[in-house]
Each structure stands twice: as C-alpha cells, then as structure tokens.
C-alpha cells in the first residue's frame, strides 16, 4: 500500500500473524521518517525480551498482553508504549495541533510539560475521562503472574526453536 495525503501512520507487525514473516523495521522506519509519519510496531510475537523496536526506529509500540507477555491467555489486555520521539506538531495531526475545547483549549502537541509525550498523554487522559478505561484488577494480577516468568519462557522457546531448526536442517 502506498503512502498518500491521508496516511497518518505506518503500522507493521514485527513478526506477522499468521505467516510469522519478520518485518525489516529499519527499512519501514526509514520510509516513515521520509514521509514525516509515526511508525507503530506491533511487537506482540517478539515480546520486549527478544526485540526492542525503539532501537529500530519505532515511535509507538503495541503488545497484546493476552498472548506471550501474560503467558497463559486467561486475561485480556493490551499495552501501548510511546517512545516520545515523534513530533506531533505537523498540521496533518489536527488532534495534537488544534486547541482541544474539552481540555481547556490545550494543544496536545505544544502545551504539555517536558516529559509528557503528546500521543500517549492524550491516549491515556481522554479515554480515562470519557470511558473510565482501565484494566480490571483480576486481569492485571493474572498478567503480572505471566510477566514474572517471561525471561524463563522466552529462553525455553528460543532453545526449543533452535532444536527444531537443527532437526529440520
């Protein structure tokens, strides 16, 4: 798909589902930067243990907590991580440039204090105000249980995958 005047971000799965194709994040990042667009990377399959998308040019990283991070599929959740590197002051991003009447005419891309990235700050505050969006305590607890074993699970997954690769070689 081509980048055009309506494009507002580039989105890529680091490891695609279901074919498990691996994206060239550095190349996709170069395209995003050339067009002045944020790169959003879904790193669910790689987990932060195996891949750090910000080191490859990602601006925003998303994960399904239900799969690898939680480790057991019993709790629903997701996470969005903003690297704080993208400049949201381009006129294409009107939600961040124009005054937001519902927040005392705050311009998200300009008026936030240092250390408050515009994208994630707006993403956290607006749904929280409008919907009360937050993860349930039970789901949070179950996901934390899975996070405790993430390093061990990833090491075992990698060791098992290497054994399969040698066998199939």
Identify the residue ranges that each predicted region occupies:
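Conserved PLP-enzyme active-site core in the AAT-like
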Residues: 1-169
């Amino acid at each position: 798909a081509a980048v055009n005047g309506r494009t507002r971000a580039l989105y890529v799965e680091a490891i695609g589902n279901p074919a498990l194709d691996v994206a060239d994040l550095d190349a996709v990042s170069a395209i995003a930067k050339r067009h002045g667009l944020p790169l959003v990377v879904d790193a669910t399959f790689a987990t932060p243990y195996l891949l750090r998308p910000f080191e490859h040019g990602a601006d925003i990283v998303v994960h399904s907590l239900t799969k690898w991070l939680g480790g057991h599929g019993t709790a629903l959740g997701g996470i969005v991580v903003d690297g704080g590197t993208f400049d949201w002051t381009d006129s294409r991003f009107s939600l961040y440039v124009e005054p937001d009447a519902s927040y005392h005419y705050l311009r998200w891309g300009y008026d936030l204090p240092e250390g408050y990235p515009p994208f994630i700050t707006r993403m956290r505050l607006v749904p929280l105000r409008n919907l009360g969006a937050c993860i349930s305590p039970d789901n949070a607890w179950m996901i934390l249980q899975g996070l405790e074993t993430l390093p061990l699970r990833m090491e075992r997954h990698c060791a098992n995958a290497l054994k399969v690769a040698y066998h199939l070689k």
